[in-house]
Each structure stands twice: as structure tokens, then as C-alpha cells.
Regions:
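Glycine-rich acetyl-CoA-binding "A-motif" of GNAT/NAT acetyltransferases
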Residues: 63-64, 71-77, 160, 260-262
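Conserved acetyl-CoA-binding loop-helix of GNAT-fold acetyltransferases
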Residues: 121, 127-141, 167, 329-343
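C-terminal functional modules
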Residues: 342, 348-413
Length: 413
């Protein structure tokens, strides 16, 4: 018996991979669990990245049949990974020391990173070192492609995952952003009448993001690819009413040269067309109460009852990313944008709106969410793979202190 790790082939592996996915989704009957439906595409969560790879682990056994020795192969695990270039730090331009009196802003330092996700091992084949083999093989591909750091996200309560990556594979705790989840109600969310919301073109959004957010940790260098992706439903900016009426919008350059006192921005990513989630293990009474709340919300929308959405069958999500803003009323602007995004998700038949922000990011207070559905501390772990660094100003990024904000790539949520 041996384990062979190789690249995923849709033609020969799809059925077996889906079987392993389903077997890994069997949780304790007494507990509520969250399961992912990949809609027939095991690559759906990585295929929009600049470079990606999926590996499968095959268990090869020798069997005897009619006096002949044969090899029997079956897939018992898989892992996914993608590569991109992101911001890992900042520095001042080279001429800053020569002209210290000139007002200059720091510029981003980029590095090539890899993200690991979707590690699955068949329950009957665990504790055989298969997960370590998959991680090691994936890291070989990362290194071959010039990756300097590899990182992943997991739950701090997932002891098996933490033990595998932190104790066996050399990863360490790095960042702990917060995942904020808001149900989509039957009634429309309130959007402040003191706020005007404008939709930007991908090019306009790119200009603002690069000018204002490119020094934020994990900012993707290929932000233009994200904004032009078909899954991106748009970038929206909130300003005080009448400050920048749609008919007077003169473009991002003039906006940035003379911005209003307060403003905020976010983009919406449509996960609904790529994958869906499902809550399993809820009691019959719990499902009944949730259904009753939805009926009441639909019949009496003016009461604005915070109904519990239909999460007990596959449901869609809109992911909000690139949240930010400036000014004393930026939080109010963010709240209005989130209300607008809620109503957009309602139009698209989604049950949940989610985002992920820095744990101590001030913007967090402006994002409506249910604590019971959210995760205050999503654990990100990192490992240094390359000896050569993109810039000497950074040093060893794994030992750096976190900033207030973090840019979460929607392609990896």
C-alpha cells in the first residue's frame, strides 16, 4: 500500500473527489455544522486566481484477482492552492532622504504569496500522513513558482488543522481578522437619506483602490483583474448627499483631489454563482422557529422583524470586500453601504452577506452582523518558504506586527 500525490484531472477524478468531499461533510448528528456545495466544480474557489493547482492523494493497494496481482487506486484526499502578488509592507521612495521636506507618501512593497485551502482527507484514511504529503507537495509547487510565503486560514478551535500546520508543517499564527455575517431579511435594509451611493466603473474603482488602499496588508497587485471579473457585481462609494450627485460625478481623480469630509467604499463579490453553503444538524424546532420568523417578516415587512433566513438548504452569499473610508462620518457611510449591499443580495436571492476585516479595524463597528453567525477571530497562519525577499525593508514578514486593516481577496473567501 502506498500514497501517490498527483494533479487533479476533472475527467478521471471528479466523481471520486465529490465522494471524498461528501464524506468529510458528515459531522456529529448532535451539532450544527456548515457545509460547502461546490456546484460540480472542485476548482471553483481557486480558478479566478492568477495561478492555481489542485492535488489529489491516491491510495494504491495491491490486490489479487483470479491469481493475478492488480493495483487498485482510489482518491482519499485533496488540497488546493493559488499564487498571487500582494502588499506585505511599505517604504518611502528612494529620493525621500534627498528631499525630506517634500511631502511623500509610503509606497507598497509587494511579495509573491501562496494560499492553501480546501484540504480534505477521507475520514477512514486519516492519521496516515496523507495531509502532510499533500501540503509538502503543494509547497514544492509554490517554491518552484517563486513563492516567498505560504498562508492559510483555519478555525482556532480546529485542533487537528492547527496541529497539522503549526506543529508538523512549520506554520505559525500570523493574523486574526474577523468574519462578519449578516442574514438577508425579507424586508429592505435602511439606507440613510443623508448619504448618496454611486456605482463606479472597474477602472474608476481601481484608481481609488490603488491610490488609497495599495499600502494595506494583503492588497492584491492584480486588483484590476478582480474588479473586472464577472463575479464582481460592482464597487460603490458613499458620500454626503449632494456632495457628489451622480450628474456631477467628474471621475476619481477630481474626487481624490478634493474629497468630501467623509466617504466610504466597498465592492460586492457574487459567491452565489460559484459555491453555496448549507447548515445541517439543526433541530426540527429550530427550523420551525426560523420559518415562522421569515413568514412574519414577509407578511409584516414594516415591522422590520430580524428574521432568520433559509439556511437549512443550499444558500447563496454575497461577499463584501475592499471596505474603507475616511472622515468623521465614515462609519455612517459604511452602514449605508452595507444596507445597500443587503438589498442587492435580496434582489439576487442570497440569504447571507458576509465580509472579513481586521479585528481592530474601526470600520468593523459600521458593519451590521449577527454575532452567532460571525467569527471574531479567524486564524491565519503563515510560513516563510523563500530565503530571498522582495525588499530588504520588510525583513521576515512572518515576524511583523499586524496593522489595523487587512485586504481580503474575495477570490479566496
Amino acid at each position: 500500500m502506498k500514497i501517490v500525490v498527483r494533479e487533479f484531472s476533472r475527467e478521471r477524478d471528479l466523481e471520486e473527489v465529490e465522494q471524498v468531499e461528501r464524506s468529510c461533510e458528515v459531522g456529529p448528528a448532535s451539532k450544527i455544522s456548515l457545509f460547502t456545495h461546490l456546484l460540480g466544480d472542485p476548482l471553483c474557489r481557486i480558478r479566478h486566481s492568477p495561478a492555481f493547482l489542485m492535488l489529489v492523494a491516491e491510495l494504491v493497494e495491491e490486490v489479487e484477482e483470479n491469481g493475478r496481482k492488480l493495483e487498485r487506486r482510489r482518491i482519499v484526499g485533496m488540497i488546493r492552492g493559488c499564487i498571487k502578488t500582494i502588499t506585505c509592507g511599505t517604504k518611502y521612495p528612494r529620493n525621500f532622504r534627498s528631499y525630506p521636506t517634500v511631502s511623500q507618501k509610503p509606497v507598497p512593497i509587494y511579495t509573491k504569496v501562496a494560499y492553501i485551502l480546501g484540504l480534505r482527507i477521507s475520514p477512514s484514511n486519516r492519521r496516515m500522513g496523507i495531509a502532510s504529503k499533500l501540503v509538502n507537495k503543494m509547497e514544492e509547487w509554490f517554491i518552484k513558482n517563486g513563492v516567498e510565503y505560504s498562508y492559510l486560514a483555519t478555525e482556532s478551535e480546529n485542533e487537528a488543522s492547527v496541529k497539522l500546520f503549526n506543529h508538523k508543517c512549520g506554520y505559525s499564527k500570523f493574523r486574526t481578522p474577523s468574519i462578519l455575517v449578516q442574514p438577508v431579511f425579507a424586508h429592505r435594509a435602511k439606507v440613510s437619506k443623508r448619504v448618496t451611493i454611486l456605482k463606479l466603473t472597474p477602472h474608476e474603482a481601481e484608481i481609488i483602490y490603488r491610490r488609497k488602499f495599495s499600502t494595506t496588508e494583503f492588497f492584491p497587485r492584480d486588483i484590476d483583474s478582480i474588479l473586472n471579473n464577472k463575479l464582481n457585481l460592482g464597487t460603490f462609494i458613499a458620500v454626503p448627499r449632494d456632495a457628489h450627485a451622480p450628474i456631477n460625478w467628474s471621475g476619481p481623480e477630481k474626487f481624490l483631489s478634493n474629497p468630501p469630509e467623509s466617504w466610504a467604499i466597498l465592492s460586492v463579490w457574487n459567491c452565489n454563482d460559484v459555491w453555496r453553503l448549507e447548515v445541517r444538524g439543526a433541530s426540527r424546532m429550530g427550523k420551525g422557529l426560523a420559518k415562522t420568523s421569515r413568514i412574519m417578516d414577509r407578511v409584516f415587512p414594516f415591522l422590520k422583524i430580524p428574521s432568520f433566513p433559509e439556511l437549512f438548504r443550499p444558500f447563496g452569499i454575497h461577499f463584501l470586500y475592499g471596505l474603507g473610508g475616511e472622515g468623521p462620518k465614515a462609519i455612517e457611510m459604511v452602514k449605508s453601504l452595507c444596507g445597500f449591499a443587503h438589498n442587492l443580495a435580496q434582489q439576487h436571492g442570497c440569504s447571507v452577506v458576509a465580509t472579513e476585516v481586521g479585528r481592530d479595524d474601526p470600520i468593523k463597528t459600521g458593519v451590521p452582523h449577527w454575532k452567532k453567525l460571525s467569527c471574531d477571530e479567524d486564524l491565519w497562519c503563515i510560513k516563510r518558504l523563500g530565503e530571498d525577499y522582495s525588499d530588504g525593508f520588510v525583513g521576515d514578514w512572518t515576524k511583523s506586527s499586524p496593522g489595523l486593516s487587512i485586504f481580503v481577496d474575495p477570490r479566496e473567501f
